[in-house]
């Protein structure tokens, strides 16, 4: 356990939430790409440990979609490049703090001829925040696919009002509005 505790450290990239929020040297999309790159992996037995940081979110908590994406990225670093994500299942244990680094503990469950399976446990100083299991499959092997047909008579996404457009008038009145108007790497059409 000492090895895990030594790897968990306070958020080294900023002095508090305000500094994270006011990072202006990168666009929101560039910040997202940087967060998804994660740190340098270190190996111990059949585990790989990788540090990651968080994007700003107005609550001060780690956004769940971010940590799921980072878990998939961490797991993908431990499989052959020819294996692509097949599935991921995640279970949120507790809220994460954006001021602390995330530690991704990737356990190699199995490497078969066609599939690889990984378990990812994401921790911070207070303990586990997410546990996920990811499966990867050789890219040239096709399996059974299921998909519903695309619905008809739905509006074109570009014709819809974006979250950014809706939130801009309220950006100075609400941290959430400011986030969606200026800081979010995603723009949601409604």
Describe the predicted segments one by one.
Residues 4, 8-190:
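Terminal targeting signals and extreme-terminal segments of soluble enzymes
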């Amino acid at each position: 356990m000492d090895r895990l505790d030594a790897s968990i450290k306070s958020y080294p990239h900023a002095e508090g939430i305000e500094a994270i929020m006011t990072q202006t040297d990168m666009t929101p999309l560039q910040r997202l790409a940087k967060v998804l790159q994660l740190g340098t992996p270190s190996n111990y037995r059949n585990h790989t440990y990788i540090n990651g940081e968080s994007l700003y979110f107005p609550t001060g908590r780690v956004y769940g979609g971010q940590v799921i994406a980072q878990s998939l990225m961490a797991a993908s670093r431990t499989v052959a490049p020819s294996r692509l994500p097949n599935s991921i299942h995640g279970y949120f244990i507790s809220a994460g703090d954006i001021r602390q680094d995330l530690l991704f503990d990737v356990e190699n469950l199995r490497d078969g001829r066609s599939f690889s399976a990984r378990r990812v446990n994401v921790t911070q100083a207070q303990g586990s925040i997410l546990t996920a299991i990811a499966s990867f499959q050789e890219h040239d092997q096709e399996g059974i696919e299921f998909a519903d047909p695309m619905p008809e008579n739905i509006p074109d996404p570009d014709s819809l009002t974006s979250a950014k457009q809706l939130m801009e008038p309220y950006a100075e009145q609400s941290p959430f509005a400011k986030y969606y108007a200026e800081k979010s790497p995603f723009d949601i059409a409604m």
